[in-house]
Amino acid sequence: MATRGGYGWMVAWGCLAVDGQAAGPGLLPWLEEVLVASVIAFDVNETLLDLCALDEPFEVLLGSAALRPQWFTLMLQLAFTGGLTGQYVDFTTAQRAALAMVAERAGVPLTAAGIDGLVGRMSSLPPHPEVPDALAALARTRLRLVALTNSVQPVAEAQLASAGLRGYFEAVLSADGTGHLKPAPQPYRAVADRCGVPIGQVRLVAAHAWDIAGALAAGCQAAFVARPGMVLSPLGDPPGITGPDLAAVAEQIITLDG
C-alpha cells in the first residue's frame, strides 16, 4: 500500500480503497487532488535542453569534449555543497568555478574571457529533438506547464527563448528565487504556491535522479526522462512515470493526468 498525505491507498482488482475502505463518491474530489496532477513542472538543463552542444567548445578550449560531463557534475557538487554548508552559491557562479577547476585539473590555461564565453553558451542550448512536439502535445491538454530550473532567472528565460520553447510555459521559475537549489524542498513548493494548487498536484519531469528524489520528498509526483547515461537511484520511492525520452513520458502523462 502506498501512502500520500498520511492516508493509505491501493488499487487492486479494479477497485480503489483508502485506508481499507472502498472509495465512495464523497472521496472522489480528494482522490483527484492527491492522485492526478494538474501542473507539470519541467527541469530544463539536460531534461529539455541538450548539453552535448557544449562538446565542441570544450574541445576547442580545453582539448577534450569528455571534460563537459565532468564539469557539469563538479558544478552540481559545488552548488549542493554551498546549500548544505549554508553558503549559497547560484548556478552561474558554480558553473564558472567548476570550469576553472576542470581547466586546472587538466593543466589547461583558461582566461576569464574563455570562461565567460563557454558559460555564456548555456543560454543558447538547443532542445532535444523530440521536446518541441512533446510539449506541444501536452499544451493541448488541460494541464498547466511551467519550467523549474536551478539556472538563474535571466539565463532560464534566455535558454527557453533561444530554444523556441518559452511559449509552452505559463511561468518560468528559478530555484534561485527561493535561495535554495533543487533538490531542496523550497523550489518545488514554490511551483505549488505560484500555481495555487496543492503540492500533490504538481508533477516534476526531470532527467536527474536527485531532482526526482527531491520532488517526491517535497510531496510532488514525478516523471523520469531516462536519457542516455541517466538512471534512477535504487534508494527511495520510484516515480510514477518513466520513459526513454520526453515523447514517451508525455504520452504517459497525458494518459494519467491529461
Q: What is each PLM-predicted segment?
A:
Residues 12, 16-17, 27-37, 132, ...:
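Asp-based, Mg2+/Mn2+-dependent phosphohydrolase catalytic module
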Residues 92-93, 110-147, 157, 185:
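Short, acidic loop-to-helix structural element flanking the phosphoryl-transfer center
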Residues 79-117:
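A metal-dependent, Asp-based hydrolase signature
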Residues 55, 68, 72, 92-100, ...:
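An amphipathic alpha-helix signature
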Residues 31-76:
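Active-site neighborhood of HAD-like aspartate-dependent phosphohydrolases
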Residues 63-70, 106-116, 199:
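Short, surface-exposed acidic
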Residues 56-57, 97-101, 117, 133, ...:
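Alpha-helical elements of Rossmann-like donor-binding domains used by nucleotide-donor carbohydrate transfer enzymes
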Residues 1-3, 7:
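Polybasic, low-complexity intrinsically disordered segments
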